[in-house]
């Protein structure tokens, strides 16, 4: 979503997972810190939400991009990967292309005139199948309620000073 929207900066809680501020460095974004007692999710920009630990029915926030995580400690634990939720159909198509080597799925790439840079971020079919197999149990299981103090204050780490 950050690449799609062309963001130049992100606002990151001091307490979150380490990869979020690393993302700013990777993408050349300006990183700003905020003190926030967030629960379940937080906004990185006006419409991009880190919802990596969120697991609640009907929790999508309209007109946003909500990133979910399936990392091994998350409720739907697949070891890696995630999902981006949006209600913007045009954005969904473009972001799918960005995740899939710039191409549309189900059409051989040689038959496409590629117009989008791709980043090879797609989920493997095996991981997706594993997720579908685990989904019924995840739906029936009460999720862990994460609290902001589950993460250290990243601004105190040497890498960010």
Residue ranges and their predicted role:
Residues 1-5, 10, 49, 66-67, ...:
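Generic low-polarity alpha-helical segments
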Residues 2-60:
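PLP-dependent aminotransferase-like
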Residues 55-57, 65-161:
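Active-site region of PLP-dependent enzymes
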